[in-house]
Amino acid sequence: KAVWEAGAEIIAVQATHHYRDDGKLAYETIREIKENIPEALIFADVSTAEDARIAAEMGADFVAPTLAGYTKAGAFDKLEIKDAPDYILLRDIVDAVKGTGARVIMEGKVATPEIAVQCLYMGAYAVVVGNAITRPHITAKRFARALNRFHD
């Protein structure tokens, strides 16, 4: 409630199959906020398409695979360097929330304008461009890795 009273119009919450300190699943936070502040927009950070479906059913206005790879359910091989979003997960999330009113925000590995447009074509309502802007050394490493592959 303090976040809302401070002026936030959108409240981001973890919406995964993890238990909070009070023993409830993280998804429950969405329902609790909507019950107390119905006009609040909820941005659900999810890990899987199932998380997205549950979050949307609980009342999330936006879902994003922000936590993909960071939870047990959405884990991927940390040794593998991924230079592109998980398009299969994006498609699955778009399908999972279809008809619920929740909008999909693609977040993670949106490193080029072409990737951003591809995500929109696949059903994302919007994209978040993070590291490509805020950490240019990571963008430079991606280019170097791709160009080095050409010479291999």
List the predicted regions and their residue ranges.
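Short beta-strand/loop segments at the ligand-binding rim of alpha/beta enzyme cores
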Residues: 34-44, 96-107
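Non-cysteine beta-strand/loop elements that form the S-adenosyl-L-methionine
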Residues: 61-69
